[in-house]
């Protein structure tokens, strides 16, 4: 449950952050993780997940970012999301959000693999809930919820109970996405949100995210954790591969498939080249 790019042309070369050319737009630091150290201790051992990890997401073009984190199990991808969401603190280090150190009061929505809703409430009640909690007028809250319900493709489902089997798993994830965005967050975290869905629902939900990302009234930085290279390339304009022991950034890519991409881009040579390049680098990891 959620709480409540400039172009390479046809090149797919991984680049360090320091080489990014920003043109006339001054890049905005969205997220900065500095000198992050994460140690898990037991009576008999000490496991170091991160040892002075640095991780940065910038809004390069002034249009938000869709960033994906790839990596094998245990490299710390989901832990990074938990830091940003405020669900976990590192052993040491700084977490900076839009130039300010993150506090316990900060709430950043996060969507997980297992869909979650309040099953005793309707779809529109679920989506409007974060605004109701903030004491927004009910009419205003429901109007905003209706807008997002339409964007995520649930028109006509507003008054259904938000539970399975009245709604499918894919529909319940749409409810979660709409609820996470209704209070106008600047960041949305996605931890393997579609891995439990069939390919049809997965493709449809990918398109929902792209529709939201392209919507000029929804200014959100999306951060996706996934094991699916094709999904990461399709959705992202920035992509990171992580390695483990200790967890750190291994490669970084800018993905230039255009802001108005759709499923047909998956048949293009440019998309295929990106996927092959990322796969080759990913497969070098131990």
Feature locations, PLM:
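Helix-to-loop junction immediately C-terminal to a conserved catalytic motif
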Residues: 85
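Short helical segment in ABC ATPase nucleotide-binding domains corresponding to the A-loop/adjacent helical element
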Residues: 124-132, 142, 146
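Conserved ABC transporter NBD signature motif
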Residues: 93-104
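Conserved catalytic motifs of ABC-family nucleotide-binding domains
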Residues: 184
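Conserved ABC ATPase signature
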Residues: 163-167, 171
């Amino acid at each position: 449950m959620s709480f409540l790019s400039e172009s390479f042309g046809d090149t797919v070369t991984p680049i360090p952050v320091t080489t990014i050319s920003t043109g006339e737009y001054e890049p905005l630091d969205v997220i900065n993780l500095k000198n992050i150290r994460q140690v898990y201790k037991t009576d008999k051992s000490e496991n170091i997940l991160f040892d002075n990890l640095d991780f940065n997401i910038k809004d390069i073009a002034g249009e938000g970012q869709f960033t994906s984190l790839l990596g094998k199990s245990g490299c710390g991808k989901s832990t990074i999301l938990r830091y940003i969401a405020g669900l976990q603190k590192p052993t040491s280090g700084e977490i900076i959000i839009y130039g300010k150190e993150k506090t316990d009061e900060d709430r950043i929505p996060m969507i997980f693999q297992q869909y979650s809703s309040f099953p005793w409430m309707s779809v529109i009640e679920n989506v409007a809930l974060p605004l109701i909690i903030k004491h927004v007028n009910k009419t205003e809250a429901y109007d905003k919820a209706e807008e997002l319900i339409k964007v995520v493709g649930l028109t006509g489902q507003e008054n259904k109970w938000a539970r399975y089997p009245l709604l499918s798993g894919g529909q319940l994830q749409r409810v979660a996405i709409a609820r996470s965005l209704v209070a106008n967050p600047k960041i949305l975290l996605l931890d393997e949100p579609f891995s439990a869905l069939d390919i049809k629902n997965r493709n449809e939900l990918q398109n929902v995210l792209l529709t939201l990302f392209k919507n000029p009234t929804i200014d959100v930085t999306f951060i996706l954790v996934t094991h699916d290279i094709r999904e990461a390339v399709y959705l992202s304009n920035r992509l990171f591969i992580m390695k483990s022991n200790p967890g750190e950034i291994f490669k970084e890519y800018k993905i230039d498939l255009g802001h108005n991409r759709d499923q047909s881009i998956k048949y293009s040579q440019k998309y295929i080249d990106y996927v092959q390049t990322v796969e080759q680098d990913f497969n070098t990891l131990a």
